[in-house]
Amino acid sequence: DGSVEVRDRARGIPVDIDAIEAIAKKHNLKVIYDSAQAHMAEYNGKGIGAFGDACTYSFYATKNLGTGEGGMVTVNNADLAIGFLRSHGETDKYLHESIGFNYRMNDITGAIGLSKLETLKPETNRRRAVADIYASRIDAIDGVHRPVPTKGSNPAWHLYTCRVDLDALTCTRDEFCAALNKEGVPTAVHY
């Protein structure tokens, strides 16, 4: 028995969950999905938190559901001991069976998160609409390669990251980014 953490939901695009879960089942692995950038992303019509043994989300200020700091773990496996971490490893009063940590969010960041839940779905739908526009227009540009979502996925589009083949363009990367910024499309070099 073991576990595997899947950290490939970068930019809000779900991975091929069917393939990962098949491998996990074959090797008797627990799967923990890192969905820090994938709030509201879906795979085969289900929210991504429905898959694996656990799913983690980040509420850092730059995320789609940012509260300043904090996060959340959803669990699909009753045997998974998330409660140990929440309660400092305490299973019974004064009985600690594992090392625990205090990662509780404070009331203020919790209230910010609850208030932002009201706008998360419409904001995600807006991101999806913008991503569709980007996809239709980027496909016509030689040398610019857009992200292609995994079959069956409905991304949350935390970021829309393109790969640019500078040899195919007649400008530098900085000139390309400046032209996009001038048109109201913010750009940045990440990672």
Model segments located where?
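PLP-dependent aminotransferase class I/II
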Residues: 6-8, 13-20, 26, 42, ...
